[in-house]
Regions:
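Histidine- and aromatic-enriched segments that form or immediately flank copper-ligand environments
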Residues: 1-92, 170-199, 219-236, 321-459, ...
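Short, structured patches in soluble enzyme cores that scaffold and shape functional sites
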Residues: 56, 69, 82-84, 103-105, ...
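Extracytoplasmic/periplasmic copper-protein system
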Residues: 76-103, 235-276, 435, 478-506
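Acidic-aromatic/histidine active-site loop/patch
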Residues: 95-167, 265-279, 309, 316-318, ...
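Conserved small-residue hotspots that stabilize compact domain segments
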Residues: 177-187, 191-194, 198-252, 256-291
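Intrinsic disorder/low-complexity detector
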Residues: 255-312, 322-324, 334-337, 342-360, ...
Length: 506
């Protein structure tokens, strides 16, 4: 789809501030409307409004929008579905229906208070109180036994499920009992179809899957369950259920009782759920995601082969009495003004342009920092950005670190999609790393695996200030983020336009 959009966003009086980020929208020449607080705009204060204006250029598929300040994303989120333009279909058999499924977390406590507690205490947050499918907790909680998200299907028909992980701090499995899913899209980009019995989505990722109603008439649980590869991290060890229900005049719509192991046509069948830390299965699943076809009209592959800038980014947690997180041992400090506004108006003192291209010291990253190298465990704190010339082909190597403990980090880049060329176990070695330049997936969020590395490439052809951060909200709070400043080009349509007149002020 190509088309312009204007969206009016207002912060209601009982919220101090908010704003909206259009996750996955590449915002071509519209960086002012990208949305992250203190990066491209100031928050929209209570009672104020701001009109987002941007063009969807050669994009389609399942994306989503969410708040991008504090932990308001816990409940302030929703789907953004971009359909193919008229006359252009799907590269697969059209489904009879489609359904959006948003995976989320439910908190009994005020999430803004939780964020303040994390900052003030220096510790980690507790796990959420429940997981939700489209806002519903499902049958395993006393308060919600009848609040179950349900999809009605007709035997023999095909359905498209658009699945979004909007959770704050948890990666999740998704599966449907006795059904195989065919993956056809990730992060709004078509993929080579492949069959799977489960998905694993990091926060910020989306998957489109086809599912055929080819089982016996009855009910089947749709399940979301936590994936937690990090050791000793607190999280809710619980599953939430929805129902896939086959329509039939002989099956009555009964109230669902407690989870039962009795398998009848009236009791939903349960899926087989992977172990909570089954990293091998998750890696095998992720490795199947490929671009549709290298030279196909639906998704041409244009991987930059000549690299202008290579960046080696270590990512992970730090500890020195309090938890911190960093990129190249720099913990990001959010400024008090919008970085984009500071850049455009040449405001001094709000950021520096010396973000390191690589770690100060090289060592065995995965197995932890040597105790005698304090710089590797005590991060610097600052608001530093990395400068990219317009049009540069950029390669970024993400390296997970084990200073506190290895963990999976879903890294999201604003303003661009990127080619995920490969991942590998241990410390990155350019002489042995196997990179896929033929049909790599095109994504906006990459789950850097536990104790592994990941390599991406993109072309920096969109001027502006672009945030890159871990989509586990607690890690962003601790500072696992940075920003790229992409400079103006010399040609037509290569310069950042002036700010809108109604841009919120700090």
């Amino acid at each position: 789809l190509t088309g312009s959009i204007s969206l009016y966003y207002k912060t209601v009086q009982n919220i101090n501030y908010s704003h909206c980020q259009w996750h996955g929208v590449r915002q071509r020449l519209t960086c002012w409307f990208d949305g992250p607080a203190y990066i491209t705009q100031c928050p929209i204060q209570a009672g104020q409004s701001f009109k987002y204006r941007f063009t969807l250029l050669n994009q389609r598929g399942t994306l989503f929008w969410h708040a991008h300040i504090s932990w308001l994303r816990a409940t302030v989120h929703g789907p953004l579905i971009i359909y193919p333009k008229q006359g252009v279909g799907y590269p697969f058999q059209p489904p009879v229906e489609e359904h959006v499924i948003i995976l989320g977390e439910y908190w009994l406590r005020d999430v803004q208070g939780l964020e303040r507690h994390v900052k003030e205490s220096g510790g980690g947050p507790p796990g959420s109180d429940a997981y939700t499918l489209n806002g519903l907790l499902g049958p395993l909680h006393n308060c919600s036994r009848d609040d179950i998200y349900t999809i009605n299907v007709t035997k023999g028909k095909n359905y498209l499920l658009r699945i979004i992980n909007a959770a704050l701090n948890m990666e999740h499995f998704f599966m449907v009992a006795n059904h195989t899913m065919t993956v056809v899209e990730t992060d709004g980009e078509y993929t080579k179809p492949f069959k799977t019995t489960f998905l694993m989505l990091t926060p910020g990722q989306t998957y489109n899957v086809l599912i055929k109603a080819d089982q016996s008439i009855g009910k089947y649980f749709m399940a979301m369950a936590p994936y937690m590869p990090a050791k000793n991290a607190p999280f809710l060890k619980k599953t939430s259920y929805g129902i896939l229900r086959y329509a039939s005049p002989t099956v009555k719509v009964d109230k669902l009782a407690r989870k039962s192991h009795v398998k009848t046509s009236m009791t939903p069948l349960e899926p087989i759920i992977p172990n909570v830390n089954d990293t091998a299965s998750v890696q095998a699943f992720s490795d199947q995601v490929k671009r549709l076809y290298p030279n196909h009209q639906w998704s041409p592959v244009d991987v930059p082969l000549r690299i202008d800038k290579t960046l080696f980014f270590t990512i992970g947690l730090n500890a020195g009495g309090i938890f911190a997180a960093s990129v190249n041992n720099v913990t990001f400090r959010r400024p008090t003004v919008s970085l984009l506004n500071a850049y455009y108006n040449n405001l001094q003192g709000y950021y520096s342009t010396d973000f390191p291209d690589k770690p100060e010291k090289m060592y065995d990253f995965v197995n932890g920092a040597p105790n005698n190298i304090s710089v590797d465990t005590q991060p610097a704190i600052g608001t530093q950005v990395s400068i990219l010339e317009h049009g540069w082909a950029v390669q970024v190597i993400f390296q997970d670190t084990g200073t506190v403990g290895t963990e999976k980090h879903p890294i999201h880049l604003h303003g661009f999609s990127f080619y995920l060329l490969g991942t590998g176990l241990g410390n990155y070695n350019s002489s042995t790393a196997l990179l896929n330049l033929y049909d790599p997936p095109y994504r906006n969020t990459v789950g850097v695996p536990v104790g592994r590395w990941a390599v991406i490439r993109f072309r920096a052809d969109n001027p502006g200030m672009w945030f890159m951060h871990c989509h586990l909200e607690v890690h962003t709070t601790w500072g696992l983020s940075m920003a790229f400043l992409v400079k103006n080009g010399k040609g037509k349509m290569q310069n950042l336009p002036p700010p809108p007149l109604d841009l919120p002020l700090c």
